[in-house]
């Protein structure tokens, strides 16, 4: 065996959605801001993403993270997230997993509040403890807002409307009933197909761009909303993002975008609890902490709560003789 690269990771999951935290083998990442660091990774470190997200080391639904030094003077650390298509701007389930893993493995000190630099902006996370274990993690996300509502869509003789909202990334929100589908495993393949069609349709018709950050643009995912199954849940959802990737969790940034749409419609009030259920029957708890503005858009600061579990400690190698050493994806 010949080894040209060695990577170490700690893997975790949040309501079934994986997070692979890369703890060793990462070269220096250049950039003054976290957004600049994201661009650097896109230009120079995409091979690392492919090696650790793609098969045979990962899979189509794998999600990853690199913990960086803080980009701002008052933050504890920074995060960069990756998936099957590229490098994302924020990831809510990732924040929950990073805080849990960092505390339970001794990477982070045992404290309640953490300030995190993400490409989408500053995120504040809070750990709730049960003895020495992390019981749950809450995070105050970046200001989230409805970008456009009631956007008309016409695809394959179907006519319907979506709301476009930002929760750290841009999402289109649609009711699964528009297609006669339920948010369950049986209808998942059809939902994935619709997710890709809706994303491509919107991006062919309009430019979706954050009013203050040039680097935050495009539809990241499509949220399919449905009636809940569990007692006490408000809504059920599945998010299709990146290249047809399925979020197993309720999706942290998607939940933030959903909170923004519900608040804008008057369905969710400040301080009310919103229980967002996912396709694995897991739940995130969300609420509106405060009301603010992003440029000319009314926005909310959402709080999202969930829990994570460590699944493994791994060491991966790259053999230069292996024709598949950068990995591959089967959709």
UniProtKB/Swiss-Prot annotation:
Listed GO MF terms: 4-hydroxyproline epimerase activity
Highest taxon above the source species: Bacteria
Signal peptide region: none
Pfam (any one): Pro_racemase
Family the entry assigns: Belongs to the proline racemase family.
Stored PANTHER family: TRANS-3-HYDROXY-L-PROLINE DEHYDRATASE (PTHR33442:SF1)
Protein name, entry field: Uncharacterized protein BA_0901/GBAA_0901/BAS0853
